[in-house]
Amino acid sequence: EIVETGSDGLVLARHELPFSVRLGDFMLETYPGTTRPSGFRSVVQITDLDTRKTFAAEIWMNHELHHRGYALFQSSYRQQDGREATVLSVAKDPGQSIVFAGYILLVVGMLVVLFTRIQQARVVSAGLEQQAAARRSGKSRTVPGAVVVLLALLAASAAPAAGISTDVLRRLPVQHDGRAMPLDTYAREAVWTITGSYAWQGEDPTATVTGWLFDPPAAADAPLVKIGSSDLAGALGLSSMTHASFHQLADNPRLRQLTQDARHQAQEQRPRQGVLQDAEKLEARLMTMQEVLQRESVRPLPVPGNPKARWAVPSAVTAESLAALARGPRQPGWPSPEQIDREILYNQVNPVRLSWIILLVSLGLSVLGWGRPGPGLDRCAFGFLIGGFGMMSWGIGMRWLAGDRIPAANMYESMLFLAWGVGFFAVLAYGLLHNKTVVLNAAIMAALTMALTDLLPIDRFIHPIAPVLAGTPWLAIHVPIIMVAYSVLALGLVIAHMQIGFTIFKPRGFDVIARMSELLYWYMFVGSILLIAGIFTGSMWAASSWGRYWGWDPKEVWSLVAFLAYMAILHAKHAGYLARFGIAVSSILAFQTIIMTYLGVNFVLATGMHSYGMGDSPVVMWMVIVALAEATFLVWGWAAYRKHAASPAVR
């Protein structure tokens, strides 16, 4: 068969395998109590055509079968007319080990260059420090205005529902979304899903949900279901409302028509956007609310002898019956009391919020100590930075234990690792360099990331992961490496802005600009090494899952573009094509490729295996706003640079 590709032809030939493959059985595994796949595997019989020997084997995601130089992979499966069909792929790549060896050599080579640069920097550091000290001795110190940060923690009320203590009910184990959890966790997710708020009207989520359970008529008439958008509200004839009651929405003929149109487009495999997409989300919120009103959502009774079965609802869902279950003997299949207490503690502490508050304190102390003599404030700032990093680490660990997997499978969890990577690298860098700028820019970036993670309307709850992410160590290797790479490059972004800011407002700050430029170089160098290591580990993961280590997926392409952008800057600096200001500007521009890789592919392109399918997301608008703000800042910096171009520090 000939496939035309321009003036050339690509020949596709049929290749006979030296063995036959016969499917004996296909097993689709689901998360407990759901129909969501947790894994799927094929039981096959392999018959060697030369020796006629037959053996049985199993193939599942991330666990390929090797025979006579070939590898068989479980790619996917299909369900049609009530039958399941497995999809296997085959690969033969005798050069794979050579490719992987090349990966290792490239990373090792970059590390050798990094250590060489460090050694060269140490040779000249003594002289530079003496020159800087001489310049500082003739100048008076200036102290910038103090940054005053007002911190307020709002405690949610814990009003009991139906006269029963919520502290008893919140510890009741229930099954939801494929796992067992305390009622406290389910209540928080239900309240957020239905109302769009983590604490509806400031009330304890457990009290809110039990109130709905024990008084369904009042809950159905209360305007608490989030509509989702002003366009959808207008289409439903509810223009002035952000929330409506269950009855208002369930009986709305316009909503029924919109959801029917959305289902029709889904059957035709057409994307749903705008009002149709909002209507689908609203329908999902109504389904969640309906389960609560019908008392089908709280399932605390495991099925004996069947850990995968959906748990049962008590015959009478009353405050007394649920409290009796919570106080009674532990049911087989329930999490241990320690697991329940640990997850409730994680929910109540809210380590994400607490960490960015601690990091804000670190930022304030770092700013106050910037122009002051003595290391006191700097050490305090570093101490709070360690405290914020410790709280982030504790939160990630607790989430890992609750979900029984590394928390690195969705947007929210990736942002956790982004902020954690900033703190981790900053602690290491400050320990090595003792540079107060490290603490300042790390506190800025980590506090901003954790604040956005906490305040943006992102789903923060633990959900089942796709089969390709489960049962493999690559999730715990690839994602942390790539996110720490983004973290280090984000630190470089902050320091580049600080450097250009000094060019604008304090162009004669020779020492500070020089130190910032040097720090920016190290950030870009280390970040680039981590970035290529992340690309390589992702490639190895793809090779073990699908038999190919590069598929030109949009995320793969943009990761490569980002790496090449930073490599161009580093080579241009080494060749003398870029000076300090040019490096700072180039690093800000290069980070736009990181934003495109991290957010653009997921939310703008909305294509590829890494996409979250949100092509009309507000993220698009914010990316444009950020790009315009960056362009304005760079033009301002360029004007200041041209004005003070004679200064050696600015150059």
Predicted region positions:
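Solvent-exposed, non-transmembrane regions of integral membrane proteins
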Residues: 1-651
